[in-house]
Amino acid sequence: MPEEVHLGEKEVETFAFQAEIAQLMSLIINTFYSNKEIFLWELISNASDALDKIRYESLTDPSKLDSGKELKIDIIPNTQEHTLTLVDTGIGMTKADLINNLGTIAKFQDQTEYLEEMQVKEVVEKHSQFLGYPITLYLEKEREKEISDGKAEEEKGEKEEENKDDEEKPKIEDVGSDEEDDSGKDKKKKTKKIKEKYIDQEELNKTKPIWTRNTEDITQEEYGEFYKSLTNDWKDHLAVRYFSVEEYVSRMKEIQKSIYYITGESKEQVANSAFVEQVWKRDSRVVYMTEPIDGYQLKEFDGKSLVSVTKEGLELPEDGEEKKRMEERKAKFENLCKFMKETLDKKVEMVTVSNRLVSSSCCIVTSTYSWTANMEQIMKA
């Protein structure tokens, strides 16, 4: 049976591992997580993935962020209950997925040291320098406060009347009072020192990702750490190269009206693609994008539209003679295109003669308003 607990204003259900699963997870954790800090970094990484997911989905469905939620990660240690809670505002699994696939791993005895403030800070500082989301640590702390004796008794009475824990209200505890005789009551009021509980918030990853900072402020060591984190190549990087769309536009020919780009899984894949043959032949340039989000993020720059060379409707600069030759080719191969369309039937929308190829015989393009072929593969995965 699940145990109901309260986290903030929401009710949360906690499901425990079955005995045999608990033994298996204990074996896995002690075998693969020999470095104990990894478990916390795994949770932070998962939270970051959940935030990435809702950010990506909001690009095509802005209503995903209608609630106005800030994309963030909160870390809440509780030394009394020996729990470490991570809360993100992203998209995760359904309740059924959580029950089937997850459990409360952080309660294992070896991980209790990460309830300490310095341990959490050390891990986050070490691993989160390339996360673009704020990570906030919430700690319950105590401080002494001096108030009048009457006010202290009033707050203490209210606390007993409510009979519940309230983190926002001070916990009253006598730690001392002014010594004075009865004759001095009218001259000076008694005061008491109380211990007041409060929640201390601290943003842990104040160092922002290098791509959001001025290039002049970034050291070679930071570039090296970023390269290793991004590529999992623990050798030093060879060089650093900056790319800007401004530079691309400055080198465009006057006849070129659009910025060409291609998306793919790697630089080698897009560089050897049939789609870039004609663009390179015309001495134009193509922007290689190897991150899935790139195709969503960039639509226009400085009044020039960004055009994918893998979609239909690609218009390359042509003079009068080239246009004439293209019309002749279309007329010459019109019957062949009809035959291929009839043969392929519903597998393709149309078959046309293209001016985008040089050495390749054919290519398959996507419609103007659909996903690119690379994005379709990602969504199917």
Curated annotation (Swiss-Prot):
Annotated ATP binding sites: N46, D88, K107
Main localization category: cytoplasm
Entry GO terms, CC: cytosol; extracellular exosome; perinuclear region of cytoplasm; plasma membrane; protein-containing complex
Region annotated Disordered, chain positions: 145-192
GO molecular function, one term: ATP-dependent protein folding chaperone
Phosphoserine modification, residue list: S177
Coiled-coil annotated residue ranges, if any: 315-347
Annotated InterPro entries: HATPase_C_sf, HSP90_C, Hsp90_fam, Hsp90_N, Ribosomal_Su5_D2-typ_SF
Basic and acidic residues biased stretches: 145-174
Keyword terms: ATP-binding, Chaperone, Coiled coil, Cytoplasm, Nucleotide-binding, Phosphoprotein, Stress response
Residues of the signal peptide: none
Cellular location(s): Cytoplasm
SUPFAM superfamilies tied to this protein: ATPase domain of HSP90 chaperone/DNA topoisomerase II/histidine kinase, HSP90 C-terminal domain, Ribosomal protein S5 domain 2-like
GO terms, biological process: cellular response to heat; protein folding; protein stabilization
Family the entry assigns: Belongs to the heat shock protein 90 family.
Subunit structure: Homodimer.
Function summary: Putative molecular chaperone that may promote the maturation, structural maintenance and proper regulation of specific target proteins.
Stated name of the protein: Putative heat shock protein HSP 90-beta 2
Source organism (scientific name): Homo sapiens (Human)
